[in-house]
């Protein structure tokens, strides 16, 4: 379970509290913009849903509320902002002026299990000190708040053992009681390992072809599809976020080409940016990429990609390895190949007529009668598929799975396929499983690192199997 926060000290507290429980708390450093509201449940739901959208796995957030009698129970939900603006000394001065020192601190934990949102809390009642001794050891108010209970030495909060008595501890204890009866959508290490072993065995037998999407190119700094569309919009004097509100990506790409009366707009804007001969930064990122290294080490006989760029070909060339690129029918050679065959399923920047980027280009391809579609259908009868660099909601994945199911149904030769996604989706995983698609997700939140680890595990398992044989 990931604790999503900017605060490492809070994470360390929770990590220590969870030490003797079944929960392994990891830290994901991320700043969540807080909702301006006086409804604590609304604020917590906003924070935890923001975190869940980011990670797509069980997450936890917190929020601490200080209520000071002298301020009519403020700062309340806006405690962080309040302390940044006023500081401890000003708060103490005001309490002394009002002669009101009573205060209460509440910490709320909010967990998204992947299925439900669970909220817990813990609180301490006490008072604000009348003579501050600012140590800067604590969190905001820790140096000026004295708990009323179990505090014989009358210490401020920063001097107490938080792991034994804090509001966060009370909230954590409340939370694990509530979670005990809930289903939590964890990734399962045993299942991950089994899938790695099964997939490695198929790869060793040359029974797997790869399908590579935009996430692989994005790992070395090329834009994602959304970012690419945003850049097209900005080139047409739109704010990228406003441009995205006018339709899906293919429609927006169509608009950009129509507005500029230029069917080569994609090539004109990005050919030089995506050329490693003129882009030293991109070349450096590609050369040191572990993801491309492991893809090459898999040594699959066939690779399909919906990417327009040349990163796969360029990487093979850098490493002095041969690969046969097929973007148009003239590239295709029916003779037996000694090297991997790279099928540019949605075209190549080199051939403007081959690219599938706009809405009309996509619908033109929907008849599945091009040489590329026919070859794909033949390959689907021969190989299992491993999808890399796609999200489970990607339109390309849905199209490809439709083709796969149709071809397998027509021939009674259904093959298991695999998709690796750095961000899991429990609901779509179940739907895919029903259709013979096994979803594999790692336990690391960082997408690039997670993909590197998956491919590394796969390559290492392949080496083990080859040594045995």
Which residue stretches match the model-derived regions?
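Anionic-ligand binding patches
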Residues: 1-2, 9-182
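Short Gly/Thr/Asp-enriched flexible loops that form oxyanion-binding sites at enzyme active sites
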Residues: 68-81, 222-225, 398-404
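Gly/serine-rich nucleotide phosphate-binding loop at the start of the catalytic core
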Residues: 181-296, 304, 312, 316-318, ...
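SIR2/sirtuin-family catalytic core signature
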Residues: 185-210, 216-218, 298, 319-322, ...
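Active-site-adjacent alpha/beta core region of enzyme catalytic domains
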Residues: 283-350
């Amino acid at each position: 379970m990931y604790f999503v926060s900017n605060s490492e000290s809070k994470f360390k507290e929770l990590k220590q509290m969870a030490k003797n429980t079944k929960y392994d708390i990891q830290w994901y450093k991320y700043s969540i913009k807080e909702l301006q509201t006086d409804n604590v449940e609304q604020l917590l739901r906003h924070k935890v849903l923001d975190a869940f959208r980011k990670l797509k796995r069980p997450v936890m957030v917190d929020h601490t509320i200080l209520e000071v009698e002298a301020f009519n129970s403020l700062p309340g939900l806006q405690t962080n902002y309040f302390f940044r603006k006023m500081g401890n000394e000003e708060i103490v001065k005001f309490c002394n002026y009002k002669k009101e020192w009573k205060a209460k601190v509440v910490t709320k934990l909010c967990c998204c299990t992947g299925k439900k949102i669970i909220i817990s809390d813990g609180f301490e009642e006490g008072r604000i000190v009348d003579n501050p001794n600012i140590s800067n050891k604590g969190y905001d108010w820790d140096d000026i708040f004295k708990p009323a209970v179990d505090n014989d030495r009358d210490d401020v909060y920063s001097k107490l053992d938080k792991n034994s008595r804090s509001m966060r501890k009370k909230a954590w204890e409340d939370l694990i009681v509530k979670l005990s009866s809930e289903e939590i959508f964890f990734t399962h290490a045993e299942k991950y390992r089994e899938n790695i072993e099964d997939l490695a065995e198929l790869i060793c037998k040359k029974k797997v072809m790869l399908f590579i999407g935009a996430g692989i190119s994005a790992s070395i700094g090329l834009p994602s599809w959304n970012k690419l569309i945003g850049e097209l919009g900005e080139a047409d004097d739109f704010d990228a976020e406003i441009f995205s509100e006018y339709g899906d990506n293919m429609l927006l790409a169509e608009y950009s080409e129509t507005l500029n009366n230029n069917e080569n707009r994609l090539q004109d804007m990005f050919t030089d940016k995506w050329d490693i001969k003129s882009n030293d930064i991109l070349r450096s990122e590609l050369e040191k990429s572990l993801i491309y290294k492991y893809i090459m080490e898999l040594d699959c006989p066939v690779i399909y990609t919906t990417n327009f760029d040349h990163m796969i070909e360029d990487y093979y060339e850098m490493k002095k390895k041969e690969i046969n690129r097929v973007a148009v029918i003239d590239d295709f050679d029916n003779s037996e190949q000694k090297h991997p065959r790279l099928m540019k399923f949605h075209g190549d920047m080199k051939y403007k007529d081959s690219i599938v980027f706009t809405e009309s280009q996509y619908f033109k391809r929907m008849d599945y009668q091009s040489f590329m579609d026919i070859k794909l259908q033949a390959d689907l009868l021969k190989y299992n598929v491993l999808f890399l660099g796609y999200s489970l909601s990607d339109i390309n994945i849905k199209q490809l799975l439709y083709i796969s199911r149709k071809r397998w149904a027509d021939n009674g030769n259904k093959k298991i396929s695999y998709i690796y996604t750095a961000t899991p989706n429990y609901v779509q995983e179940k739907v895919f499983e029903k259709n013979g698609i096994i979803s594999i997700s790692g336990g690391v939140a960082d997408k690039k690192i997670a993909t590197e680890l998956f491919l590394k595990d796969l390559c290492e398992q392949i080496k083990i199997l080859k040594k045995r044989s």
